[in-house]
């Protein structure tokens, strides 16, 4: 899988751009605020139909324009496929092979992308919602129906929280509607949790040996899922649903008192351990970086296992931040298999042999040469 070419219209600081890429390594060089990260972001949006940098889609549109458009042509399973994302103040539309997709969840997965940027260290050391979002985005790539159930879950969760706020103000009100919304919430929560458990087992399978290799066999990585209910990871959705039913019955009064939902996938977390110690709390910066890198490299192999083709890798201002050993391990892992985009302010710190193999692009004020 690789991107043959990309066209941008009214996107961020790009008025109009058409660019063809090498199917192996592409290095994008530019000073800060010139547009190199915007170019990487556009590839990400082409995959996920959303930005990793902002939830406000109007920021993707040039300030004096009323729309932005990202068009890409990808090679997937030996076929050349055109993709398009159009963004307006009213929302987004996605096309595959010139056919508009009725739901964005039908589009996600059309092209698979793994991004590694400095902020990805927050997967290890940041807040729980960052790790939940990581799981949701990666699962959505390999299981498009996951996105549907996630959207339905979030919709019902919002309705349920609104009702709990009302019941908080009027605690003696009828709770029949709460039971209806609880059943709907459990239906989607059970599917999400079951699929997260399956995904986590695959992530462990790939991340643990990668981490051992990067750490020169000195460290053992463990990944633990921390749910809001007591449930084993081998439980199916029916068993998970039954446990949720008992949990919500148990916390019903407390939820009404607090006016919010106290259980569900939206309250879960991932915990990373290295040699038995929580990396978030006790890990060195080097261990945190190794853990983040191991997870990203594991994603590449996991997508290949599930989809049958390697994803596209985006290394946004991160390669020069890795020491020589970690950089070598990363490049040796992906060499010849993965189309890679590297953005950097300077080629210093990037392996000479990598630059020799790469197509170089220089970005200045939204113009690529």
Swiss-Prot record:
It is found in: Cytoplasm. GO terms for cellular component: cytoplasm. GO terms for molecular function: ATP binding; single-stranded DNA binding. GO terms for biological process: DNA replication; DNA synthesis involved in DNA repair; double-strand break repair; SOS response. ATP binds at residues 30-37. It holds the Pfam family SMC_N. The keyword Iron-sulfur does not apply. Keywords: ATP-binding, Cytoplasm, DNA damage, DNA repair, DNA replication, DNA-binding, Nucleotide-binding, SOS response. Belongs to the RecF family. The RecF protein is involved in DNA metabolism; it is required for DNA replication and normal SOS inducibility. RecF binds preferentially to single-stranded, linear DNA. It also seems to bind ATP. This is DNA replication and repair protein RecF. It comes from Oceanobacillus iheyensis (strain DSM 14371 / CIP 107618 / JCM 11309 / KCTC 3954 / HTE831). The gene is recF.
């Amino acid at each position: 899988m690789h991107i043959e070419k990309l066209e941008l219209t009214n996107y961020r600081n790009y008025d109009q751009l058409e660019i063809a890429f090498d199917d192996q390594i592409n290095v994008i060089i530019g000073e800060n605020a010139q547009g190199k990260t915007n170019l990487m972001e556009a590839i990400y949006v082409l995959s996920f139909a959303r930005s990793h940098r902002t939830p406000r889609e109007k920021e993707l549109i040039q300030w004096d324009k009323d729309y932005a458009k990202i068009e890409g042509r990808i090679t997937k399973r030996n076929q050349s496929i055109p993709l398009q994302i159009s963004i307006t103040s009213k929302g987004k539309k996605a096309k595959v092979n010139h056919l508009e997709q009725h739901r964005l969840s039908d589009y996600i997965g059309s092209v698979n992308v793994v991004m590694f940027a400095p902020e990805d260290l927050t997967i290890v050391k940041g807040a729980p919602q960052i790790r939940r979002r990581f799981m949701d985005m990666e699962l959505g790539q390999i299981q498009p129906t996951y996105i549907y159930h996630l959207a339905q879950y979030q919709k019902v969760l919002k309705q349920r929280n609104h009702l709990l706020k009302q019941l908080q103000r009027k605690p003696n009100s009828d709770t029949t509607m709460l039971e209806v919304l609880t059943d709907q919430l459990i239906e989607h929560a059970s599917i999400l949790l079951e699929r997260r458990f399956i995904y986590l087992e695959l992530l462990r399978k790939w991340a643990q040996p990668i981490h051992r290799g990067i750490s020169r066999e000195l460290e053992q990585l463990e990944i633990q899922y921390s749910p809001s209910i007591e449930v084993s990871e081998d439980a199916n959705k029916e068993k998970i649903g039954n446990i949720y039913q008992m949990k919500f019955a148990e916390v019903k009064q407390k939820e009404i008192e607090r006016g919010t939902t106290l259980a569900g996938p939206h309250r879960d977390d991932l915990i990373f351990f290295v040699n038995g110690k929580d990396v978030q709390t006790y890990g060195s910066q080097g261990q945190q970086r190794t853990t983040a890198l191991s997870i990203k490299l594991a994603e590449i192999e996991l997508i290949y296992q599930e989809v049958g083709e390697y994803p596209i890798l985006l290394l946004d201002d991160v390669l020069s931040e890795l020491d020589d050993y970690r950089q070598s391990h990363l490049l040796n892992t992906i060499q010849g298999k993965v189309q890679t985009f590297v953005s950097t302010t300077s080629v210093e710190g990037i392996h000479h042999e990598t630059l020799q193999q790469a197509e170089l692009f220089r970005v200045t004020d939204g113009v690529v040469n």
